[in-house]
Swiss-Prot record:
Substrate binds at H19, K23, T45, G46, T47, T48, S65, G66, H98. This is Methylglyoxal synthase. One of its GO terms (molecular function) is methylglyoxal synthase activity. Keywords: Lyase. It catalyses: dihydroxyacetone phosphate = methylglyoxal + phosphate. The gene is mgsA. Belongs to the methylglyoxal synthase family. PROSITE patterns: METHYLGLYOXAL_SYNTH, MGS. InterPro entries: Methylgl_synth, Methylglyoxal_synth_AS, MGS-like_dom, MGS-like_dom_sf. GO terms for biological process: methylglyoxal biosynthetic process. The active site is at D71. The lineage of its organism: Bacteria, Pseudomonadati, Pseudomonadota, Gammaproteobacteria, Enterobacterales. SUPFAM superfamilies: Methylglyoxal synthase-like. It holds the Pfam family MGS.
Amino acid sequence: MELTTRTLPTRKHIALVAHDHCKQMLMNWVERHQPLLEKHDLYATGTTGNLIQRATGMDVNAMLSGPMGGDQQVGALISEGKIDVLIFFWDPLNAVPHDPDVKALLRLATVWNIPVATNVSTADFIIQSPHFNDAVDILIPDYARYLAERLK
């Protein structure tokens, strides 16, 4: 597939997602990095987003709860170029009924080449990157070219 460039803006659109057993870990991470996160636009699945709003007072665009379609809503935003970073603390030791949605979310983040953290260490690396508050060019699939080729 041909690639094109997308610029992640200085003010990032960050999706925050956490499975039930990982919500407190994400809450602790968000509270620790609140001064940095306040400079960006936050999105989250339903329960996680509401917990973050309640604990920090930050504005969060809360989707539906993950099992009710929230993971798919975040995935749709990624494929539309509306999410720049995904912080997704998922529980690798417990299966969830919406595992296919989880896999789809991670697949879309990979397809669209956005930074993804699935644990605290990686999330720290991303937020502490010297590029976190800069505009950054990434390579993404050239969907217009892809579609044109398929419609020949």
